[in-house]
Regions:
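Short, acidic, metal-binding catalytic loop of nucleotide-sugar glycosyltransferases
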Residues: 23-35
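Residues at the starts of beta-strands that form the adenosine-phosphate
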Residues: 3, 36-37, 90, 199
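Short beta-strand-to-loop acidic/aromatic patch adjacent to the donor-nucleotide binding site
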Residues: 89-97
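N-proximal low-complexity "stem/linker" segments adjacent to membrane-targeting elements
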Residues: 1-24
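Short beta-strand/turn micro-motifs composed of small residues
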Residues: 8-10, 42-44, 121, 204
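Conserved catalytic core of nucleotide-sugar-dependent glycosyltransferases
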Residues: 101-174
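Active-site-proximal specificity loops/subdomain of glycosyltransferases
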Residues: 43-88
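C-terminal catalytic/acceptor-binding lobe
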Residues: 17, 21, 174-311
Length: 312
């Protein structure tokens, strides 16, 4: 029977908020506390003073382990080292720039218990197919969600079941760099899991914070997702995805029967705003049709079929 473990990559420039971040995940910070290890992955070329700081983090919770890993993998180190050492475990990746709501882990684990063969993700990144056979990855940080103005936040927190990357290029450093420059780990993991025909289930577009959110957690300069998510960069990565893996991805996604069973905080507002709401990686669509009135259901189906988001 596999364990559930947490895995995070961090760097010295993130020390300022790391303690708060970790405390939101341990010692009663979460309603789910059943994970067996919390791996904090750091580069193997840091100063001694940095390692001393990280080693002290183990005093917070006895499940915390500090893993020194090859820094050249950059943001992919949130998953790569633990995929190698814990191949039979389910791995939840957590970011070091988020103060996690109390039910973040529980929501992932509950969905995983019902869908053991799927990746479970809090963040939904749409993927669309063009008439000329191209796959287009849409970074969700380019989607202007009004809910973000009301204390909502996007996060890459995800649960990866055991062996979803078996037989893929996920450990191929040269291909990872050719595709992402080490900046967009989520693209690398999406490509490889999709090539393995692994479905992804999204819990909703955004996570809600409980209580008052400290303003510094909204600091765009602090959050790597905002630094890495420039629209011009996304166009570059889309070109690379299609060059390296486009035909295989297109064939898999275009022949996939999508289920519409994931909910959103404000489904009506979302349908009003977006024409391209819906490919969750190669996984399931973002809304629950049963929550719609008949008129809104027809409007929703017309929109997504018109834009060739899914085969309904």
């Amino acid at each position: 029977m596999s364990d559930i473990v947490l895995s995070m990559a961090t760097m010295p420039s993130r020390k300022k908020r790391l303690l708060e971040n970790i405390q939101s995940l341990v010692n009663g910070g979460q309603t789910y506390d059943g994970f067996t290890k919390f791996y904090i992955n750091v580069s193997d070329d840091l100063e001694d003073s940095d390692y001393e700081f990280y080693e002290k983090l183990k005093d917070i919770d006895d499940r915390i382990e500090i893993v020194r890993c090859d820094g050249k993998w950059r943001s992919c180190n949130k998953l790569i080292p633990i995929l190698k050492s814990n191949a039979d475990d389910a791995i939840i990746t957590v970011d070091d720039d988020i103060f996690y709501p109390r039910e973040s882990l529980e929501r992932l684990v509950n969905e995983y218990e019902k869908n053991k063969d799927c990746i479970i993700a809090h963040e939904i990144n749409p993927v669309i197919l063009s008439d000329d056979g191209l796959v287009t990855y849409l970074n969700s940080f380019d989607v202007k969600l009004k809910q973000r103005e009301y204390g909502k936040y996007l996060t890459g927190c995800a649960l990866f079941p055991p062996h979803v990357f078996d037989g893929t290029d996920v450990f191929n450093y040269d291909k990872m760099m050719e595709l992402t420059d080490g900046c967009h780990d989520e693209i690398w993991f999406w490509v490889n899991s999709t090539l393995n025909k692994v479905q992804v289930i999204g819990l909703n577009y955004i996570l809600s914070f409980e209580g008052e959110v400290k303003s510094e957690w909204h600091d765009d300069e602090f959050r790597l997702c905002n630094i890495n998510s420039d629209a011009s960069n996304i166009r570059i990565y889309n070109h690379r995805v299609n060059k390296l893996y486009g035909k295989e991805l297109y064939d898999i996604i275009s022949n996939f029967k999508v289920e519409i069973n994931v909910t959103c905080d404000n489904i009506y507002q979302a349908i009003e705003q977006y024409d391209y709401i819906i490919y969750l990686y190669a996984g399931r669509a973002a809304f629950n049709l049963n929550s719609l009135t008949k008129a809104w259901r027809e409007r929703f189906i017309n929109r997504i079929t018109k834009n060739k988001m899914i085969r309904y």
